[in-house]
Amino acid sequence: MTIQTVTDAICYVGVDDNTLALFENQYSVQPMGVSYNSYVILDEKIAVMDSVDARAAEEWLSNVAQVLEGRNPDYLVVTHMEPDHSGSLMRLAQKYPEMKIVGNAKTFTLIKQFFGTGAWSEDRMLEVGERDTLSLGLHRLRFLLAPMVHWPEVMTAYEETEKILFSADAFGRFGSLERTARAPWVPQARRYYYNIIGKYGAQVQALLKKISALEIKTICPLHGPVLTEGLEECLRLYDLWSQWEPEESESILIAHASIHGNTAHAAKTLKGKLEKKGVQVNICDLTVTDLSYAVASAFYCGKLVLASATYDGGLFPPMREFLEHLRTKGFRNRRVGLIEDGSWAPAAARLMRTKLEEMKDIHLYETVVSLRGTLNQTSEAQMDALVAELCAE
């Protein structure tokens, strides 16, 4: 990744990873890749803002050295200790033995857990707390703790002179900078938010409250592009997302899990009926779609229809996994319709209802479409009744 200038005194020294298949070993990041972001503030004193994943250490160290032009960094500021951001921390600390490590109390607890108690001497650790400042010369960092956005040690750093928020994982996005330079921020930021941070909406709200009084001209996250335009919209969406509110309250996601295609056919039939009535419909095949896309779409829409086959007397596994992801990420405040399929003993609707009862403020439509293999006159009538309910609000 080419070194980029954020401002005259601040450089981007992060690294693109276009070979990683699964982010956190579960979310697809192909073909768009992912970036591990790091920044250098050049002043009377020099601060490196976070490190990168160990798999990108060599390129990152080269980028940092190129920007330093023979100078030594005074500080490594650690806003987040997850290994994709701390994986190269020790490499930089060993290369520059006079450099101090800046973090909060929980940062240093995790450093000792990850790297051992003898990683470096105590006098190299500079502990900061809420609203503490670190002067670099013309630039000054003010630290705002952001616990559980999405790890307990997370903090942000606000550079007061140039009005830059170093936001840790908040406002991040999937996609390497090289491959997604012209891509809109929102789709992959939404997918990133709901799958990585989404469970912690209350904590995101607390962070948004802290930064609401700040004048922010630039946001520098740990994944995705540096944000300089449309910041008001980014903040608005984070406020909406962290309250688990839909972006499109009248749009519908139909998520289906079909074994031999009959349940999928019913889902597509429902989609056609709804579209004839002018409804915006997204449809997702849970047997082939990366679940992170399905989760993001479920939160985007105001209504959800679940269509699942019965399998071994239980839910077909792709639907069961989808519902577990939704529960884990705090899915709530939605209206949900159910379609079940079972050739001799359909049980999917009852089992989906049980899963949904574990979530907050989920309201089920009265009509359940129940198939015995394929749509027939009875189930078609049920589907028409469900369409009427979905369109009544």
Per-region residue spans from a language model:
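Metallo-beta-lactamase
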Residues: 4-8, 102-154, 200-208
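Active-site metal-binding motif and surrounding structural segment of the metallo-beta-lactamase
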Residues: 44, 55-102
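Short acidic active-site motifs
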Residues: 88, 289-294
